[in-house]
Amino acid sequence: MTDPIATSSTAAKELLDMDGRASEQRLIQLRIRQQQERAVKELRDAIGIHQCKKGIFCLVKQSKISYEITATDHRLSYELGPQRQKFTCMVGINPIVITQQSGDTKGCIQCSCDSTECIYTLLKTLCGLRDLLPMN
């Protein structure tokens, strides 16, 4: 009786030998795609568990976020749609209404570390971004 694992391993090796570089390229692309899919899942999970005192007003919850891992760095890109604020106050007996609108905001936070836990630090940085760089 033949060993099925050895047979499949031999068959895979023969396929690799027959196809050569094309198979290597496909395997590399497959690994890169799997790494990107893991990064997207990790991002979704990290956003889901993020909690702060700002609640739904936190930039982490309001922004459209993407996470990229390259050979040398990590990049968290964010996009925030237009926002509108309305404020009413009384001056004497007359109400004054102040309306403010801002356009799209896009940016990225980038680091060049080799930590696998970097996503959480980048999300915390995005969360506190309004405190660091007040936009309005």
From Swiss-Prot:
UniProt cross-references to InterPro entries, sorted A to Z: Adeno_E3-15
Native source species: Human adenovirus B serotype 3
TM helices/strands, residue ranges: none
Entry-linked Pfam families: Adeno_E3_15_3
Keywords, ordered alphabetically: Early protein, Host-virus interaction, Inhibition of host caspases by virus, Modulation of host cell apoptosis by virus
UniProt family annotation: Belongs to the adenoviridae E3_15 family.
This protein's record includes keyword Nucleotide-binding: no
Record function comment: Protects virus-infected cells from TNF-induced cytolysis.
Keyword Hydrolase in record: no
Biological-process GO terms, alphabetical: symbiont-mediated perturbation of host defense response; symbiont-mediated suppression of host apoptosis
Protein's UniProt name: Early E3 15.3 kDa protein
